[in-house]
Amino acid sequence: MRGFWANRLIDLHPIRCYNNLDFERKKTESGGISMKKGNPIALLPIGVFLVLYLGLGLWFEYGLHIPMGFYNIPIVIAFLVAILVACLQNRSLSFDEKLELMGQGVGDKNIITMLLIFLCAGAFVGVVGRSSAQSVAYFMLHIIPPKFAVAVLFIVACFVSTAMGTSVGTITLLTPIAVEVANASDFAVALCVGTVVGGAMFGDNLSFISDTTIAACNGQGCAMKDKFRGNFFIALPAALGTLALVLALTMGRDTAPIDQSYNLIQIIPYVLVLIGGIVGINVFVVLLMGIASGAVIMLATNQMAATDLLSAMGSGAGGMFETSMVAILVAAMCALIRAHGGFDALLYLIRKLFKGNRGGQLGMGLLVGTMDIATANNTVAIVMANPIAKEMSADYGISPKRAACLLDTFSCIFQGVIPYGAQMLVAITACAEMGVQISAFDIMGYLYYPYLLLVSSLVAIFVIGEKKK
């Protein structure tokens, strides 16, 4: 299936989407698919975005030493400038025709679905709040012996991030607990915090309500449960390896008991969301179940008044506004880049460098990884890579669920280790609030899960391969 974009370009006939381009057609290893050289200049908007967002971000962070300076760059403005550059290209198309292209890109069913899920997921997190997730964390730490505290931190981070669907939220919640565990023992703070960051990326990769999962599945047109099943068998070996490594490093040491209160009733919404997602219930139904159960619990236990509950839902959904706007702007920009021949040029280069199905899978992973290094946002990286990956799936014979799995996994690998990513910066900030000064490079030495996830992914690509039905 050539996908949405190919159909839309046909719909716009007789508009000329390419001007004086030298196309070359030849057979590819994946089975006789034509290959176009495209127009590399059409990729200029992406370059402009990278200069504005990555360049200025690094300058603010490391040149001007502004705390979390990388995230002081308004990503929406950076994309607006990039879209302006795209609109100035290809004079054979009028501005109205370019607006039509952008409108059709934004109006894609997958984009609309993704936006609605973002808002529902935000409302869910707003309803249940941090106290519910904290109950999950302290409950698991309570039932497992304290001497396994660091290993428990990893398990808790995996579970909470899978239930919450956010790595940053998990790190914000658990980093103070990690510092407390380190203070109650002779474990290094960097080890405890690095373990939490790794576990948080596990759930970010697998959760049904994670924006990365939503973006990857909707962008590639696959069911979330299918992506989860394939992704799980890549993530599980890495998680087990991380757990074994952490146990080997910490066994034999005793820690003081961590006595914090928790409320079992507050765990129910997260459990419902997790179970509903695993069994394959429609994601909207799952989120509505979580929102409804969370609302009933909050009202029944007098933790929120009805007005406060509505305000919390609105605040949670509002937290997704920037992510939603970025998805809209990326869809518009990618529509123009595709029409101008930019994606054909990028695909031409990838086909030249990577051969066969396995090479295509690696190329897809490196593509989204490069996007993530540039944007420091794995959701944005996936949204940007989606249309290119869709073409690669057809060319290299990669199934939609495999493509979604690769995009999500590799984006989480890169996002979990870059020193200027939100996850790392939030962890450092949380440590500082607890009175502990630590650098990103201290933590990077203990990020066992992302490193092992890379190994597991490469084994899945080159040794095991994709099972075809």
Language model: regions and residue ranges:
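Juxtamembrane helix-boundary/capping and inter-helix hinge elements in multi-pass membrane proteins
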Residues: R91-S94, G107-K109, D186-A190, A215-K227, ...
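Membrane-interfacial loop-to-helix junctions in multi-pass transporters
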Residues: D108-M114, Y138-V156, A182-C192, L236, ...
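Core transmembrane alpha-helical segments of multi-pass membrane transporters/permeases
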Residues: N72-L80, L84-Q89, K98-S132, K147, ...
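Juxtamembrane and boundary regions of transmembrane helices in multi-pass small-molecule transporters
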Residues: K37, G198-M201, N205-S261, I265, ...
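Hydrophobic mid-bilayer segments of alpha-helices in multi-pass membrane transport proteins
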Residues: I41-L54, G69-R91, I112-C120, A151, ...
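Hydrophobic alpha-helical transmembrane segments of multi-pass integral membrane proteins
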Residues: M114-V125, P145-I177, L353-K390, D395-Y396, ...
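Interfacial loop-to-helix junctions that mark the boundaries of transmembrane helices
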Residues: K36-G38, Y62-V76, Q104-K109, L141-P145, ...
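Alpha-helical transmembrane segments of multi-pass membrane proteins
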Residues: I117, K147-V160, D186-G203, G359-D372, ...
